[in-house]
Amino acid sequence: MDSAAQSNQAQSVFGQTGTARVKRGMAEMLKGGVIMDVVIPEQARIAEGSGAVAVMALERVPSDIRAQGGVSRMSDPDMIESIIAAVTIPVMAKARIGHFVEAQILQSLGVDYIDESEVLTPADYTHHIDKWKFTVPFVCGATNLGEALRRINEGAAMIRSKGEAGTGDVSNATTHMRAIAGDIRRLTSLSEDELYVAAKELHAPYELVIEVARTNKLPVTLFTAGGIATPADAAMMMQLGAEGIFVGSGIFKSSDPAQRAAAIVKATTFYDDPDVLAKVSRGLGEAMAGIDVEQIAQPDRLAQRGW
């Protein structure tokens, strides 16, 4: 579904643009899909042709951001608009944590979603963006349930469990998805009095804690990101509870991006069918080189950004 049709469907179903229901509904429409990082229009067209449900427009994929260092900021508006013009699927773009003016610019450009991203250099170490002030839906990362609920309380319409972006090492994504799922399971077993205590421990609003305990899930869509480089990685994260996949460097840093992109899309759809997974894992060529997360010093880990 292209971005215009998606927006029209959200309005027809929910009746009003910019409300929490509409923004969460737009995120729901991406469930079960793969969102791919792209840096040029040709990559965006490859992603769309491979079955991606959306693309993330940025000037450097996370592995290049990590390798080149320096301050990483919002992408150039001309580059973002060239991606928007190249595809019919939704386009996301990243703003720095806390940089509400970058978010204002991205909304003005007409992106379909904004990712307040730890991959970029944070602009504010005490405040995230007040996402309620925007009509465009926001995506935010989280390493645990408390972090996820704080972002939702700020207006996030989608949460992605944080892996370590730009590494090709899925271990952090696994750790944080298990942490979120484990925290949710724990809440479902608590009494009302214990949930008050849990809300304080999580530094999260009691109302959201109650909702999670009652429904056994987050109140918004939960994707995963960071380190996913193979079809098997994508399928594992779906089996662990992700409702969709972000893939950054793993596709366009591989030897055959189009084939790997299509394989990861298929693995995300048929994540519980080992026969399909074996088939799509064949003949993909070399995956991205990758970095062992354990070799990265804690202060240099992107997933630790945010609070």
Swiss-Prot record:
InterPro entries: Aldolase_TIM (IPR013785), PdxS/SNZ (IPR001852), PdxS/SNZ_N (IPR033755), RibuloseP-bd_barrel (IPR011060). It is an enzyme of class 4 (lyase). D-ribose 5-phosphate binds at residues 37, 166, 227, 248-249. GO terms for biological process: amino acid metabolic process; pyridoxal phosphate biosynthetic process; pyridoxine biosynthetic process. It catalyses: aldehydo-D-ribose 5-phosphate + D-glyceraldehyde 3-phosphate + L-glutamine = pyridoxal 5'-phosphate + L-glutamate + phosphate + 3 H2O + H(+). Its EC number is 4.3.3.6. Pfam families: SOR_SNZ. One of its GO terms (molecular function) is pyridoxal 5'-phosphate synthase (glutamine hydrolysing) activity. Pathway: Cofactor biosynthesis; pyridoxal 5'-phosphate biosynthesis. D-glyceraldehyde 3-phosphate binds at residue 178. Keywords: Lyase, Pyridoxal phosphate, Schiff base. The active site is at 94 (schiff-base intermediate with d-ribose 5-phosphate). CDD domains: pdxS (cd04727). The keyword Phosphoprotein does not apply. HAMAP family: PdxS. Belongs to the PdxS/SNZ family. In the presence of PdxT, forms a dodecamer of heterodimers. Catalyzes the formation of pyridoxal 5'-phosphate from ribose 5-phosphate (RBP), glyceraldehyde 3-phosphate (G3P) and ammonia. The ammonia is provided by the PdxT subunit. Can also use ribulose 5-phosphate and dihydroxyacetone phosphate as substrates, resulting from enzyme-catalyzed isomerization of RBP and G3P, respectively. This is Pyridoxal 5'-phosphate synthase subunit PdxS. It comes from Mycobacterium leprae (strain TN).
